[in-house]
Amino acid sequence: MREPNLYVILSHALIGCGFFFLYVQHVRVIFETRTNIQQLNQLEREALLRREDALYYAFYKQLAEGPDFWHGYEQLKNVTDIEYPHSVNVLQRFYVLPELVTAYFFHVVRSGFNPMVQPMQFYLEFVWLMGGVTLLVLYLYGTLLSENIFGGIYGVISYLMFHSFVAKIYERPLARENFAFPFIFLQMFYLCICIGRIIHRQRHTSRMFMIFAMSLFTACALLSWQFSTFIFTTQILIMMTSWNASALPTALVNAFVLDYSLSHLLGHALAFVMSHGNSQLLLTWQLSISLFLFLITMVRQLRHVRSRRLGHAQDLLNGDLFSLKFLMLTLLLASSVQTTLIELFNRAGVVSVTEGDQQHFFDICAHWALQVNVGFVAHLSACNPQYARVAWSELWQLVKTMIVKPYCMYGVVMLAMFFRRWRKSGAPVSALTEEQRERARKYVLEDFIEEHFVSMSDMSSKETEKQLYKCFRLLKSCDYDYERYKRAQASLRKEQPPARDDFMQDIKRLRAQINRNSVKQRKERAQETKEAATDGASTPTEEEDKDPEAESESKKKNQEPGSGETETESAADPTETPPSRSADNEEEEEEHSATAAGCGSNSSGHRQRKRSSSRRSSVVPTANAQILNMHYVYSFLQMLVFTLIGLAVRKLFFLSFTQGCVIAPTVCSKLWYHRQRNIFWSVSLAVFLLSMFDPGMVNIREEYFPTRYSKSGDDLDSMLEWIKLNTERDAVFAGPVDIIGTVHLTTKRPIVNHAHLEMRQIAERTEHVYSVYSRQQSSDIYNQCAQLKIQYLIISLDECTNEVRDDCDLLAIWDDKQPAYQKYPQFCHELLHKNVPSFLKVFANDHYGIIKMFSQSVQINLKHNKMPEMSI
């Protein structure tokens, strides 16, 4: 990976900004086409938000409607109407960083630029901008790995054509992953940049900036989405495995791993402080593994420094064994420390720690993988379509369109090229006469004399004869075709700038080595002068024995341990660079390029020999070895992990698809056409895009004009209007997690449960509320609801049929949990058709019903026309 200059960086930034604004407009138009939000009133707009999205928008609305930002900020520290009657610190319990940032800038814009800006419009624009950041990073990431601008363009086009497989930002704009994934993607992209710089420079620079940037990205992701910690945990495990198996020097690896683990620790600390002490951030696998990774790497670094001071050579076997033990020990300590810290924190009373988040997701995984009976709430979450597994038919359609079909067409192209070369290699060459060959040699000789200004006396020199022989050999490889010879010569001359860059990098390394050698020689002269003054002149054999020792001392003194960069010995000594597996192929390619260089200029032969000899020992990887570099290995392994996660949870499949858009153009360009990029990007790119054009356009048309999409027809608007008109301002509601947050958002009525079922206390409350769908007795259900101080209970009429249709019916879930009650009828079905003491149906439409709960001391035999709710 070569470092681009300023103009290349600016050009990539300009192209990426173009994709950024294109994608922002793309998702904005899709959302407007699907919802027609500009024509809706405020209640209808807010009714579009369901589950936790409505809850988070309620927090943003409270921040935006205040006189200033800090007034709403203080109100969020003590909220009593989302888990009534308990008081909740929203900043500590929920992932509200996007709402805080958006509300802050909303107040800035409203007070200084546009007083008429609408809160929801401003919020949605912020969401579209975050989606644009994702596409911008996707383009830069693809360009970085493929080292070609068309690699980023290919990833962007694939992302847009199959947008239905990514995070559907236009369907759920307020989903937490829409805010967190841009920061996760930025952290992954910057990590690959740092790894590439280390491999190219063989030293670790900009350590403070790397720690700061990665800590900031990590903290922002952790404060925006609860799944971020799982993603970062997989990243740490991948980095631990791949760095231990790498061939880089131990000191360089240790320096980078220390900074990498420290960035995760600082990111966790920053997130913990900004969330006012969120206890869930204290006991995550990410924090435990990164902590022990930092500590054990410190031990490893001290062990390495001590062995160098003692002059011991590095034992590769012991190093590998230590790396394996260090990896296993880290995982063991990280797994064992979880329960210990939970118990210590709870007993000390420092923070109230529960296992809610992790235990909830572990129960879901156990239900999927082992088909075991888990809790009611875990079974309810597993039946959520967002957490369902990806259908095999849908997965096969994606694989067939993006992998099988393009690569089959690409295989046909490769096969045709192979047969063309095979037929050309087997064609007879005797068609040329000796006269034509001699004429071609004369043309080449004339060109050589004119270009190099060679006199007849210079023709006898060995250097000139060698250069001329190279030109004749190039002519022979072109079948003595003079026109082909000129084209081959011109094309090979164009390939010299990359080699010249490598040559200049090697010159810089040699210059640094010469400076170190000069310092060493001066010290040796001073030492010899001192010894000559005292003991006399030393013998040459003694000086030779002291050379290695003096050289090692000078190297130790030249290396500054406290500086901001760590420079390895392999960068100074080319002979210590590990050999590449494709060294023979590289020597042939360099010899072929040296032929063109020798024909191009008189002085190029000497420069090319220097460049060829230096490049063989350069630390820059060869063509075939670049695909095995650390940043490629990490990106590919991260895609495999994302694929496993996405296949298990449909909601997270966008992780695999987005990373696949980055990897797809890289594999082809690196494995097959590293040297001949023009062939790959002119032929292969066209083949790939043409194979995906038709299904891609179908997907784009389906996004703008969906055939299976219809607006929600559940009559929720009418129920919300009834609640606003016929209930008290402090009436307490409970109901299905899909709509209870919307009820709180639009009516501002207190609620006792919400959609964050991973929280243990909310899971228990939701189980009590959903007991109305079970077969329990009315007295038991009333006692459970009375403990929560519920006044109005919203029920879904579709779940009150007293029939079991599939395993995800609420009645089926309750039957699995309480098999002894299967002989009784469903309570909510009886509630809708009979008079039940302490329960009264006051509202019903085609989809929802509202039940008012009374104290058992109140008589329920009143007539319906005497109830104020029934007189409407």
Curated annotation (Swiss-Prot):
Q: Which CDD domains does the record match to this protein?
A: Dpy19 (cd20177)
Principal subcellular localisation of the protein: membrane
UniProt lists compositionally biased (Basic and acidic residues) regions at 524-533
- Cite the residue spans of the region called Disordered: 514-620
Localization terms from the record: Membrane
Task: Output the InterPro entries linked to this UniProt entry.
Answer: Dpy-19/Dpy-19-like (IPR018732), Dpy19 (IPR047462)
Q: Which keywords does the record carry?
A: Coiled coil, Glycosyltransferase, Membrane, Transferase, Transmembrane, Transmembrane helix
Q: How does it sit in the membrane?
A: Multi-pass membrane protein
**Keyword RNA-binding tagged:** no
Q: What is this enzyme's class at the first EC digit?
A: transferase
Q: Which residues cross the membrane?
A: 4-24, 126-146, 149-169, 179-199, 211-231, 257-277, 279-299, 326-346, 399-419, 627-647, 678-698
**Keyword check for Nucleotide-binding:** no
- EC number(s) recorded for this UniProt protein: 2.4.1.-
One GO biological process this protein is involved in is: protein C-linked glycosylation
Q: Which family does it belong to?
A: Belongs to the dpy-19 family.
Question: What is the protein's given name?
Answer: C-mannosyltransferase dpy-19 homolog
Please name the source species. Answer: Drosophila melanogaster (Fruit fly)
